Amino acid sequence: MKKYVLTLLCPLWLVAQAQKPVATPEKPNVIIVIADDLGYGDLSCYGEKTIHTPAVDALAKQGLRFTNAHTTAATCTPSRYSLLTGLYNWRRNDTGITDGDAAMVIRPEQTTIADLFKTAGYTTGAIGKWHLGLGAEKGGQDWNGFITPGASDIGFDYSYLMAATADRVPCVWIENQRVANYDPSAPISVSYRAP
């Protein structure tokens, strides 16, 4: 009788095991921090004794740190372009430091690191100084409406950006390709050309 019960229970147990959901490993969060005018020697997690950087140190302790990193350029637009596209900035003539009314340097048809992360199932975002241009042509942005192409056209699900730098107009924040807190009674007009 025991043999009969075991013969009956074993297949039932195997079927029950096959029905259990398989746990999928959780993907790690990936945060890339780009800081202008900051060398690795400026951070206390890399040995700096004078400047204390506890927030960055906490991130470094919990995550991955670069110990042998290189850049294609020592300035903003070119290094951002190369990081996001994986391409050398000096192979294009429009990847120098951009004005606030520059056309977007990264073309929507180019593959970016954001595209690769999205393909891998990540939600992507870009926050902070953009300095890669926005819109299709220099000076052609509609600062009072939807600005395209922009970050969503090159793989980012969410963006909250400053177009260039705090010393280059327009000095506004742009959320998902629209000026944040836009006031229609005070339209924005930007020109880098002499009147």
Which residue stretches match the model-derived regions?
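Bacterial Sec-dependent N-terminal signal peptides
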Residues: M1-P25
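Formylglycine-dependent sulfatase
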Residues: Q19-P195
